Amino acid sequence: MYRFLGLTIHGGLIKRGLDNSDTRVVSASMGFYGRCVSLGFANKLFDEMPKRDDLAWNEIVMVNLRSGNWEKAVELFREMQFSGAKAYDSTMVKLLQVCSNKEGFAEGRQIHGYVLRLGLESNVSMCNSLIVMYSRNGKLELSRKVFNSMKDRNLSSWNSILSSYTKLGYVDDAIGLLDEMEICGLKPDIVTWNSLLSGYASKGLSKDAIAVLKRMQIAGLKPSTSSISSLLQAVAEPGHLKLGKAIHGYILRNQLWYDVYVETTLIDMYIKTGYLPYARMVFDMMDAKNIVAWNSLVSGLSYACLLKDAEALMIRMEKEGIKPDAITWNSLASGYATLGKPEKALDVIGKMKEKGVAPNVVSWTAIFSGCSKNGNFRNALKVFIKMQEEGVGPNAATMSTLLKILGCLSLLHSGKEVHGFCLRKNLICDAYVATALVDMYGKSGDLQSAIEIFWGIKNKSLASWNCMLMGYAMFGRGEEGIAAFSVMLEAGMEPDAITFTSVLSVCKNSGLVQEGWKYFDLMRSRYGIIPTIEHCSCMVDLLGRSGYLDEAWDFIQTMSLKPDATIWGAFLSSCKIHRDLELAEIAWKRLQVLEPHNSANYMMMINLYSNLNRWEDVERIRNLMRNNRVRVQDLWSWIQIDQTVHIFYAEGKTHPDEGDIYFELYKLVSEMKKSGYVPDTSCIHQDISDSEKEKLLMGHTEKLAMTYGLIKKKGLAPIRVVKNTNICSDSHTVAKYMSVLRNREIVLQEGARVHHFRDGKCSCNDSW
């Protein structure tokens, strides 16, 4: 109706020759056509104007902004400056709002320059828009600079800067701003408090979020639905069910139940705290279920691997007139992949196509990531290849997962290729990709590359710090790891339980007993983190390996958690190193109850008994293994030469170049003996002569792989070998000699430890 009326009026103006007579008339016409007819026609009217004043220029810029054509709007704004026309404050504020996305950041900086040239920095609305524009582009220091330059600040100014801090993760600084704001005589409103609640929620800091809520209530403000939703997000993690239920009670008492967003967030909270029955109850009680509510429950059921229930819910969903979207299907596909059923997950992709829902990069990444979580890396890589065949380009999440997989497989060469891809596609700026690169290089035995990437990250997340600390731990670089942790604390980053696992691993792998105790106590006293089994295992391993077996025993007896197989395994390993049979047999008995089929425990006892020449006990353990049908883990090592991975097995399949390898190895050992090498025959757990033991030592897979690397890898390229079990002390010694005699760096990886040999020394300083 209004469109027809507008066209009629404009037609009448044209008939009377008044359509171009007054710029106010033309400007109004441009506004009408831009809103109701066609942006192109509005621009045509502007182009045909014989004379343009400030009103016309500002109107055409606003017309393009309202229509979403921000690039044209910015172009017109530049032309406007050359014409001498003056931009209205409202036009520039709107332009700055549009330039808040990353694509428009450069234009936003130019508009800021225009503001400064015209002396408009006293305009509060303009400055508020500048604060928001800079913060949304991650430029917090520039946001603060604008805020500090403001002579007059209103409540919106304070909310803008406070929101900048919370959205970029600096919530504690935002609390400081809140205090400063109150000192200046301004009373925080609901927007202020919701910004703080949202900031704490995004970091999962439930206690801090609740403290803010209490402070808000003391100030006389009642929480809004947005406040409650943020609070629910903050407690949406395992262990916080009690808090979540308390908030649910508050919602009921204060009649906030009617809000769909609150109800949906409640469902999500119950799912993430692991209480699906309550999530279903909330869902069933909803009067109006939107697509988000359905997707939340389907996602929760899929995550819990209740896939039949998830599919049944999707059928019910369609019956109630809501069509499953890509998010719904992606949840189901991820569930099947996580359950170890990639074929079923790919079937979901087929069903999506049948239903007219186009699978996207998120769909494929969901399956890819699901296989990865399940530890099924081979299937994950197959899915990635299939994704490429379908013509779906990977995004940052895909590449992060791929890098994680390559790190777990120690495929450094492939990891470098993916790194190159990320550079070409400009994905390296993504925080998750950068962190995944640090993780991949650390786990693949290239610590230097991990360090270079890590220190190049501008806004380091807690996850990136944790990855870097674990990298130092893997290499036994204790002093550097502790120094990095100190820098992290100085930067204001608050450590979590994972951080302390990394820090204690740094201490454990470097034999730093005093530092280990210091950080274990600090974790509890300053940060209120309750020690987990992982933390306790690190302490037992640290104390035991350092020779403090009695202290390790006392620690086990007094720890608040019940010792599990991880604890007793670490203790048994320490007893084996220091040949303490009495304590070893106590640990062994506990392990027989906890994990009677773990071959590693049997092998540690065989190792200890053989070193004490108790051959009858060795045979007794071997018989026990046979009776319990415990199979010794296959032993192998591998090395990549060019594009080919060469695997060396302890038994069974031989390498085609075995003759050349043994010839070179015997030659090397002869040279080593002249330099002082004495074979450590205690690594062979058989009652045979030393000469026979020495021959068996030559067949250790890591030695064959290292020797093959020396033969095939010319120049000074490092020799990188991965072994699936712990290396023996003799192989460790041989690697040190090889690094000197052949002037080569050798990187030998065994599980979560990496030994970097250079000039006859190892990065672990023989603490392993």
Swiss-Prot record:
Name this polypeptide is given: Pentatricopeptide repeat-containing protein At4g01030, mitochondrial
Listed GO MF terms: RNA binding; zinc ion binding
Transit peptide start-stop: 1-25
UniProt keyword annotations, A-Z: Mitochondrion, Repeat, Transit peptide
Subcellular location: Mitochondrion
NCBIfam families, per the entry: PPR
Pfam families: DYW_deaminase, E_motif, PPR, PPR_2, PPR_3
InterPro entries cross-referenced by the UniProt entry: DYW_dom, E_motif, Pentatricopeptide_rpt, PPR_At4g14850-like_plant, TPR-like_helical_dom_sf
Region annotation (Type E motif) ranges: 567-642
The family this protein is said to belong to: Belongs to the PPR family. PCMP-H subfamily.
Organism in which the protein naturally occurs: Arabidopsis thaliana (Mouse-ear cress)
Main location: mitochondrion
Gene Ontology biological process terms from the UniProt entry: RNA modification
GO cellular component terms given for this protein: mitochondrion
Region of interest: Type DYW motif: 674-768
Annotated region described as Type E(+) motif, given as residue ranges: 643-673
PPR repeat ranges per the UniProt record: 22-52, 53-87, 88-122, 123-153, 154-188, 189-223, 224-254, 259-289, 290-324, 325-359, 360-394, 395-429, 430-460, 461-495, 496-526, 532-562
